[in-house]
């Protein structure tokens, strides 16, 4: 089935309880919002929809207590019937009955961890402090990051399905994109095709053309695609809430040899780099491979200034399109089997434009298993129209 079964969700909570005990915590409060739902969806199997409300999730797991899920009032009704957790409350009651309920956990010397603190609004943190003034609240988001970074067989199965749809959509777009179309029209085709194939959208579809490709992200406009321009498509379908982040750049007819060569070389380089990834090696090897392959081609200046920050060469992928760990020039953590990453090569200032080739892979004992296969299985000039 295209979901995570309740048994796996419950097992995750039990693993979490053991980690809480190992850290001498009395409980944990996990927060996520509807745009980055992964921290709570990982345990609940529910992803809120943003209808006419903001609908975060808050999961409260205290020692020797059943878990409590707090969710927005409109999502509450479907969550109550579909989520395995029995104690489900409404978010707008946080400052009344939920705060009153939390007071029983207010004990001197108690420690209740907070996860997802970078998403949690100040007013909610203040409510916890007011309800439990004698409790210490250490930040323990790394517990969840460590759990989520290693994927289960079912998680990878869902991610494979999402990747297959991404590859199919980008393949269809190759014959659809034409000079004179707008960025918004390309988004419309991508989103329609993805949904027609059964996918949800993990995040907004990014389509940028020409001068707009200089940005790391861009909301599609009515700008028309012109002759010889690079057209970047970053499409993120999701199956069972598990995302794919495969992106390609198309080159319109009439382009310069310089841009054509840069795009062909980017495909060649990402193939070599992905095939070189090994378990038990440092993540910085991704950057180093890109650098070593770009330098002889005089493309290193189009790469190096842009890879020191967040997501410079990729990132983890799963319930969220972008999740821990981050890949950049300084990411010296170790690759382990069943971690999943978007491996991303961005080149900038190519006659004032930029390109991206991004493919999601699973780390294995032997090396990598590509989940996206489009850029890896086709010729280096495949995206040149």
Predicted regions and their residues:
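Active-site neighborhoods and metal-handling regions in enzymes and metal-associated proteins
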Residues: 1-385
């Amino acid at each position: 089935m295209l979901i995570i079964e309740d048994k796996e969700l419950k097992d995750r909570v039990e693993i979490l309880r053991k980690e809480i005990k190992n850290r001498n915590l009395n409980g944990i409060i996990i927060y996520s919002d509807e745009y980055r739902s992964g921290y709570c969806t990982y345990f609940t199997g529910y992803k809120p929809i943003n209808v006419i409300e903001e609908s975060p999730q808050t999961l409260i797991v205290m020692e020797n207590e059943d878990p409590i899920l707090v969710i927005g009032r409109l999502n509450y009704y479907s969550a109550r019937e579909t989520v395995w957790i029995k104690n489900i409350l409404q978010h707008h009651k946080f400052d009344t009955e939920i705060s009153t309920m939390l007071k029983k956990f207010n004990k001197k010397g108690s420690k209740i961890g907070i996860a997802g603190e970078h998403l949690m609004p100040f007013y909610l943190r203040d409510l916890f402090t007011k309800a439990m003034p004698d409790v210490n609240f250490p930040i323990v988001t790394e517990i969840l990051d460590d759990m989520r970074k290693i994927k289960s067989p079912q998680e990878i199965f869902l991610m494979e399905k999402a990747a297959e749809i991404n590859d199919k959509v980008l393949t269809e777009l190759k014959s659809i994109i034409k000079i004179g179309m707008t960025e918004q029209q390309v988004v419309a085709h991508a989103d329609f095709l993805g949904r027609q194939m059964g996918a949800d959208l993990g995040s907004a579809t990014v389509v940028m053309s020409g001068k707009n490709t200089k940005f790391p992200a861009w909301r599609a406009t009515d700008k028309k695609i012109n002759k010889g321009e690079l057209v970047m498509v970053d499409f993120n379908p999701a199956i069972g809430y598990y995302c794919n982040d495969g992106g390609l750049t198309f080159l319109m007819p009439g382009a310069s040899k310089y841009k054509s060569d840069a795009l062909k070389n980017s495909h060649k380089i990402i193939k070599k780099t992905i095939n070189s990834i090994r378990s038990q090696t440092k993540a910085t090897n991704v950057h180093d491979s890109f650098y070593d392959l770009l330098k002889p081609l005089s493309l290193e200046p189009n790469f190096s200034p842009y890879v020191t920050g967040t997501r410079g060469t990729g990132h983890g992928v799963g319930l969220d399109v972008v999740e821990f760990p981050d890949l950049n020039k300084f990411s010296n953590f170790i690759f382990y089997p069943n971690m999943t990453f978007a491996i991303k090569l961005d080149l900038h200032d190519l006659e004032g434009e930029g390109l991206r080739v991004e493919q999601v892979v699973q780390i294995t004992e032997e090396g990598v298993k590509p989940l996206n296969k489009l850029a890896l299985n086709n010729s280096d000039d495949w995206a040149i129209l």
